Design a protein with these regions (language model features):
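Intrinsically disordered, low-complexity acidic/polar and Pro/Ser/Thr-rich regulatory regions
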Residues: 136-177
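Proteins with a high burden of low-complexity, intrinsically disordered sequence enriched in S/T/G/P/A and R
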Residues: 1, 106, 112, 167-176
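A glycine-rich, hydrophobic loop/mini-helix early in the fold
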Residues: 1-24
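A structural signal for alpha-helix termini and helix-coil/disorder junctions
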Residues: 8, 12, 45, 49, ...
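Long beta-strand-rich cores associated with HINT superfamily self-processing modules
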Residues: 17, 29-139
Length: 177
């Protein structure tokens, strides 16, 4: 895969480490789309890596329907020959986005990049459904959080009322003595 990419982009072997950004990589899977920004912010704040570039395929969706957030980073590792600065790609996406991307990647491989139009259209429709699914799951999460906050507020109110009753009871007992 790396050698194919080098041939396709006419990259000589001695330039591989500086010109191919995704030799190493990690994929971070989030439950909710809004978590992606949080994770990206945490990565940006790290002092042990430097951000080379960011690609926001959430706002700039690829024509295929691909959505994800990519950061290309520089990271220093210790080797037998001393410290070495490497490039790596960090992909951040939701579980639903990852499911779609995995299927799309398999189909691209199967069709060798020449996916039939009817399959590409179905993938595009599935990508739209993934967007709707991620939004719906975020909405459900918001409702659950609102319900939990409301429940906590009610619980605090009951505690306050019971404390007031207890204080009134103590005051009334002191007056009787």
């Amino acid at each position: 895969s790396i050698l194919e990419k080098m041939q396709r982009k006419h990259i000589p072997m001695e330039k591989m480490e500086e010109e191919i950004e995704d030799i190493a990589g990690i994929r971070i899977i989030c439950q909710f789309e809004e978590d992606i920004d949080t994770v990206a912010s945490i990565i940006r704040s790290r002092s042990d890596m430097t951000i080379k570039s960011e690609k926001n395929y959430l706002k700039h969706i690829k024509q295929s329907g691909y959505r994800s957030y990519h950061l290309i980073i520089y990271y220093t590792v210790d080797t037998i020959n001393g410290p070495k600065r490497l490039q790596a790609e960090i992909q951040i996406r939701t579980m639903a986005m990852n499911f779609w991307a995995t299927i799309e990647h398999s189909l691209q491989y199967k069709y060798k990049g020449e996916m039939p139009l009817h399959v590409a259209e179905r993938l595009s429709n599935a990508a739209d459904a993934i967007i709707a699914l991620d939004r719906e799951m975020s909405s459900v999460r918001d409702e659950i959080m609102d319900a939990q906050n409301s429940s906590q507020t009610q619980s605090n109110l009951v505690k306050d009322i019971l404390l007031s009753i207890e204080n009134l009871y103590k005051i009334s007992n002191k007056r009787e003595v």
